[in-house]
Amino acid sequence: MIKRAITGIQASGRQHLGNFLGVMQGLKQLQSQYQLFLFVADLHAITVDFEPTMLKDNNLQLVKTLLALGLDYGKVNLFLQSDLMEHTMLGYLMLTQSNLGELQRMTQFKTKKLAQKRNSNNTITIPTGLLTYPVLMAADILLYQPDIVPVGNDQKQHLELTNDLAKRVAKKFKLKLKLPVFIENKDTNRIMDLSNPLKKMSKSNPDQNGVIYLDDSKETIIKKVRKATTDSFNKIRFAKKTQPGVTNLLVILTALLKEEVNHNLSKKIGSDLVKYYQNKSYLDLKNDLSSAVINVIESLKFKKAQITDEMVLKVLNDGKNQAKKVADETLKMFYKAFGLTSNQLFD
């Protein structure tokens, strides 16, 4: 029996190179090994302030980007999280079994809480969705009873909570729940900011020169890579502690050379990047990186332009139908265990 994987991608803004290398690039490998359920996490996107028209456009652009990756949608079930009410229904059941203390201890909640703007009376309004976010994530996962869950390093604590909740519910309600294995792509999980290589690449970073977006122009990409922080060693090597900027550029280039569109560049450089750049300058490295980034992003743009609204709707509808079959079965199991629904009153 084929094993199952689940992963969600949040459509809270423009997608950047960190999203591509950290999550999207690994999807092709996942689809060859697992039955993959892939969802656009639009319910998670509304846990913070949002604009409906922009959210809808972000959803569409993310779906088109995912379609442009060339995944086999006979193997991959792509859908919108909000299209399946089972996510929120199980989310509420799990919420009743969580406690305030464990949710308030979540590092991401603490960080986002501090980032909230102060009101005119110097108080802070904290959206409840920030607090309950990891419980919905637990429901997203448990709903499909997956064997593995690809994760980012910043989500590890949430996934530990998922396991804690699953064990708690399983023991209390005598449920047989599969505890998934969480896997992390350590090579590309933390693509760092080009301007500040000590920070993860993120659309929330103040200096946007360090973030390469998947819709950036060729000129913008070249400009951002040229300005990328390096050092005064003039030595190209993997040395994260002493040369974080150069190391980040090498990590990004290594990942991008795996893409088919960079076949010729990969052939030129070879498998040993440090050896190839031994007698070359930082500018040489940046020029090659610019070419590699442009090749990937321009290819994605071209493929996205070929995707019609009909293609989007068909893939999402097919994915939703397949996901619903699994989600329905799991939710029925939880409802029965919790003693819910009228047809159980006289059992």
From Swiss-Prot:
L-tryptophan binds at D140. It comes from the Bacteria. One of its GO terms (molecular function) is tryptophan-tRNA ligase activity. Disulfide bonds: none annotated. GO terms for cellular component: cytosol. CDD domains: TrpRS_core (cd00806). The keyword Transferase does not apply. It catalyses: tRNA(Trp) + L-tryptophan + ATP = L-tryptophyl-tRNA(Trp) + AMP + diphosphate + H(+). Keywords: Aminoacyl-tRNA synthetase, ATP-binding, Cytoplasm, Ligase, Nucleotide-binding, Protein biosynthesis. Its EC number is 6.1.1.2. GO terms for biological process: tryptophanyl-tRNA aminoacylation. The keyword Ligase applies. It is found in: Cytoplasm. A motif ('KMSKS' region) lies at residues 200-204. A motif ('HIGH' region) lies at residues 11-19. SUPFAM superfamilies: Nucleotidylyl transferase. Its main location: cytoplasm. It is an enzyme of class 6 (ligase). ATP binds at Q10, A11, S12, G18, N19, G152, N153, D154, I191, K200, M201, S202, K203, S204. Belongs to the class-I aminoacyl-tRNA synthetase family. HAMAP family: Trp_tRNA_synth_B. Catalyzes the attachment of tryptophan to tRNA(Trp). Homodimer. This is Tryptophan--tRNA ligase.
